[in-house]
Amino acid sequence: MSNLKQLRTRIKSVKSTQKITKAMQLVSASKLTKIKNQIAHSNFYVEAISKMMSTVLSADIYDFPIEAQKFFNTETNKANLLIVMTSERGLCRTFNYMIIKQVKSDIETLKSKGEKIKLIIIGKKGYEALKKPYESYIDSYFELPKNHDENLMLQIKQKIMALVANLEVSNCTIYFNRFKNAMTQSMTKQQILPIEKYHDDSKIEEANYEYEGENLIQNLINLYVNSQINYALLQNRASEEGSRMTAMENATNNAHDIINKLVLKLNRSRQAIITMELIEIIAGSEAV
């Protein structure tokens, strides 16, 4: 009888866990739908800014102030800025592992070359993984809010702009997961600085923008950095929720299989007990 009690307790426990994983799956699915809508709206903005930046730079008809020139600087004696985007929570398969693995590999490569390194880490999981081995390289750490927040994007942008303005870094690379679908996310390493500058006479007429302000280039740089950070944050958030939704769906299905096996085992145990009792009753009646 004690065995039956243990089985019933285990079934109850697994059912309780199944309810939790199912709820987490539904929450992630809801968040993913919302983020995918945000990505759809932001993609046009990112493409437009990138095209405008490319056109203006290749036309080469606007003045480049000293501050703006720092974003095109390819000096190698400055630090490499690595922006690492992870998550606040786990339960999302290899989402964080792949990013952290790539970042560690690149840090070791840069160290072997004697290059300077600065880290900006977004997400608790990334900070926990990188704090102990690379604490001296960490410049900033940002916690992820529960929902996509433009304030975080602005804080990261301001930090990047300050580091470049102070001539502390010469290039900037963002590490994030690019969203393909709920089942598939790809670890992405995207360099956003220095900005490539080249000349193309065919772009001169196309680049004649009517602009009122001190400097078109500097404002375009601000918009460009903003758009790249926002794009990476949205892609990473969608990848996180997609990965967690898939993980929780698998967990829910696994719980269902375990429950079925436990119920079958419970029924067989009960049947064995009943059979044993019947045998004892029959044997007792024959003895009488």
From Swiss-Prot:
Keyword list, A-Z: ATP synthesis, Cell inner membrane, Cell membrane, CF(1), Hydrogen ion transport, Ion transport, Membrane, Transport
Top-level taxon: Bacteria
MF term (GO), any: proton-transporting ATP synthase activity, rotational mechanism
An annotated GO cellular component: plasma membrane
Primary location recorded for the protein, binned into one broad class: membrane
Localization of this protein: Cell inner membrane
GO biological process: proton motive force-driven plasma membrane ATP synthesis
Protein's membrane topology: Peripheral membrane protein
Family: Belongs to the ATPase gamma chain family.
Function: Produces ATP from ADP in the presence of a proton gradient across the membrane. The gamma chain is believed to be important in regulating ATPase activity and the flow of protons through the CF(0) complex.
HAMAP family: ATP_synth_gamma_bact
Subunit structure: F-type ATPases have 2 components, CF(1) - the catalytic core - and CF(0) - the membrane proton channel. CF(1) has five subunits: alpha(3), beta(3), gamma(1), delta(1), epsilon(1). CF(0) has three main subunits: a, b and c.
Protein name, UniProt field: ATP synthase gamma chain
Organism field: Rickettsia bellii (strain OSU 85-389)
Classification lineage: Bacteria, Pseudomonadati, Pseudomonadota, Alphaproteobacteria, Rickettsiales
